[in-house]
Amino acid sequence: MAELDIQISVEDIGWPGEETLLSFCERVLGAAAVYLRDSEKQPFPTMAPEVSLVFTDDASIQDINAEWRGKDKATNVLSFPAFPVQPGKMPGPMLGDIIIARETLEREAAELEKSFDDHLTHLLVHGFLHLLGYDHMNSAEAEIMEGLETRILAQLGLSDPYEGQDLKMEP
């Protein structure tokens, strides 16, 4: 696995325990980093870059979404890169923060008929790609980012999250 320094904060009691989440996230994000390094030639710092993960609830993520994006509603995942980085370029020693809302994750997983863990995996990969400079503000960016998500998830044994879905990640 590629080394990442993963820091976790659990702010909602409905989430699994911190040790369980840390182990899960190390597996998912480690696999994503290895895929990006080996298949996409994504450079990483020699020292393990830090990723901060916050597992919260809809109310908290709604407040953050309103403050930072001007969207006063809950969302599934928010990512805040620590430093500006272009896709495929060397990131800084701190990648940034990924914040995930439990209730939205649970609701979407049920709607998509996916397990909690499978949808959490997708949201972690999606957020991680944002920290590395990928985005989906237009169709060209979305095609690249969603293609990477699909290939990384396939490495983890998961199907294409966008296949047959009209649900795309909102900008």
UniProtKB/Swiss-Prot annotation:
Q: Which of the seven top EC classes does this enzyme belong to?
A: hydrolase
Instruction: Give the matching Gene3D superfamilies.
Output: Metalloproteases ('zincins'), catalytic domain
Q: Which Gene Ontology molecular-function terms are recorded?
A: metalloendopeptidase activity; RNA endonuclease activity; zinc ion binding
Residues binding Zn(2+), per UniProt: H126, H130, H136
Q: What is its main location?
A: cytoplasm
One example of a Gene Ontology biological process annotation: rRNA processing
Taken from the UniProt entry, a GO cellular component term is: cytoplasm
Cofactor: record remark = Binds 1 zinc ion.
The answer to whether keyword rRNA processing applies is yes
Q: Which Pfam families match?
A: YbeY
Q: Which UniProt keywords apply?
A: Cytoplasm, Endonuclease, Hydrolase, Metal-binding, Nuclease, Ribosome biogenesis, rRNA processing, Zinc
E.C. number, please?
Answer: 3.1.-.-
Give the subcellular location.
Cytoplasm
Task: Identify the cofactor(s).
Answer: Zn(2+)
Give the HAMAP family listed for this entry. Answer: Endoribonucl_YbeY
- Tell me, what does this protein do in biology? Single strand-specific metallo-endoribonuclease involved in late-stage 70S ribosome quality control and in maturation of the 3' terminus of the 16S rRNA.
NCBIfam families under this entry?
rRNA maturation RNase YbeY
Query: What's the family?
Result: Belongs to the endoribonuclease YbeY family.
What protein does this entry describe? Endoribonuclease YbeY
- Organism equals Rhizobium johnstonii (strain DSM 114642 / LMG 32736 / 3841)
Phylogenetic classification of the source organism: Bacteria, Pseudomonadati, Pseudomonadota, Alphaproteobacteria, Hyphomicrobiales
